[in-house]
């Protein structure tokens, strides 16, 4: 299994904290966000870790070079932001031959990532991917799912005005090899939540965590947990 950490964002909603620091390197409890994810990946059998970069990329590259798993890491620098789906499909030749963890690195949570992988391995056969979800106290600010009795997503709406549930997308996924065969490589994808997820209703398994989960892309959330 490989992993793809999305770390290219500019963090505009986190100013002034991101004026001189890339979003993935801002600190939560005195540790850069990126390190939480790298340390979690160190606990499991990951073959290769891909990290996309853009904003203040040299700072991210310098930080990654110091990590003990640097020999497993491949940096994918984007001269122009490709978006969460664009980054994935621009590099599909690197990803398509193995299962892959896809993680938005500007999130923070303490959960056991191995439990997510085990859930994915026991998913119903029609499901191409597994989405980690949590109970959101503010569902209007999240991507909200409805699931059936088998924990399969039957609807997904990004930031709904009238949420039909409080089950929210963590933006942490396990993608199967079959997932990559579902789409044409030359399709013009940009955002994973808007361009990909809605096309996969009935094919997304879910794994719900009970731990707290935070989207650190918002300054209000960051001030709450930093």
Residue positions per predicted region:
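Conserved N-terminal catalytic core of the sugar/cofactor nucleotidyltransferase
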Residues: 2-5, 13, 27, 31-104, ...
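Conserved catalytic core of nucleotide-sugar-dependent glycosyltransferases
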Residues: 142-154
